[in-house]
Amino acid sequence: MIQLGTDAPVQGDIEIDLKNSDWKAHGHDSNPAFKNVVLHVVWQKGGTFVQPTLELEPVLDSPLADLRWWHGSDAARSYPAELLGHCCAPLRELSATQLSELLRQAALIRLQSKASQFQARARQVGWEQSLWEGMFRGLGYKRNLWPMLRLGELRSQVCPEQKPPSLLSLQARLLGVAGLLPDELSRQQASSDTYLRRLWDSWWREREVFADCTMPRSLWDFAGLRPANHPQRRLALMAHWLAEGRLSERLENWCTGSIEPARESSTLLTSLQIPKDEFWDRHWTLRSKDLDASQPLLGATRATDLAVNIILPWLWVRAVEGRNESLRCEIERRYFAWPSGEDNSVLKLARQRLFGGAAQKGLRTAAAQQGLLQVVRDFCGYSNAICSECRFPDLVKAWHR
């Protein structure tokens, strides 16, 4: 919400560009996604402009040369003291061992919480289906969790066990039900058009059968997605796992096998790998050009996310349900030893507000990251930006004593 002069406050979007002429140069003027923009923020004005514009260059509080020097200094990398969380000071009083133990306990709570969700879902649909739904959701990344989960719920319709479809048919069904099959050929990418035509040859015969559960494309959020995380690629991967039908068996074999600790993450990735896919190994999407080098449908980063959020919690609660204490302890050991995953905006902000941006030796594992996320969920998520009535600072002080 912004207020311009004495005008009434307005609520809407803010677009940032280098210069105001970029509004037309980038096609914003004809893009309906930009119809709610109420302010155009630019570095320099130039020429005419059609909406309220804020030019930044004239309002710098220091010369640009001084700001360039400051940007490379230690001061620029430190988080402003007034923005630190109230827990930052007591957290700094903890030793490295105490901090690691605090994050470890938070990570265990997160593991148990995710495991409980699998347990509750398994009571309704069984362990196998709960795993499939979790894997679909895990590949939805942060923007497309719900549509991916919905596809997981439709597994028995898309891939009936009594009559398993072929890999191509599965890819066509998943992409078709998801609403992600382009209606027209590109007429520019021969390999993409050939594969798309094969998908449609399969899908057009079945689309009426799935009409009641086919999703609109508008459900999917593509903003800011890396090519490797595109839902079309994720569904191509899921089709391979469904076609083989041995996902739970593979994971259970990995869980009970004797593996050197240093190779646990790499062997899980190997267990999840699929045969070569002639199209998807060389394309990011159904519209993309041929890639120069082959790209796996599943990489180490996404495998780590699946491990700590889906696979290990599912295996852990299975061990608990089966009263297999030794297996439960082994799964916990793997969970706490798992290498750290990809950084994200929530973790970055949490490190800045809770630790002042200082390097923390206790954040070198995926479990430590999970522990920090649990702290954010349990405390920061129930307070405000100034930490009103947050109980975490007092808990940390009590921990230190």
Regions found by a protein language model. Give the residues of each.
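Active-site-adjacent loop/helix micro-motif of nuclease/hydrolase catalytic cores
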Residues: S21-D29
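Acidic, carboxylate-rich catalytic segments that either coordinate divalent cations
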Residues: F355-R401
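Compact, glycine/acidic-enriched structural inserts
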Residues: A33, V37-Q98
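Active-site beta-strand-loop-beta-strand hairpin of nuclease catalytic cores
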Residues: I2-D13
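Active-site ExK catalytic segment of metal-dependent nucleases
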Residues: Q11-K19, H40-V42
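Hydrophobic, aromatic-lined core segments that form the binding pocket/scaffold
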Residues: L103-G371
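Short loop/turn segments at secondary-structure transitions that flank enzyme active sites
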Residues: N20-D22, K45-G47, L60-S62, Y141, ...
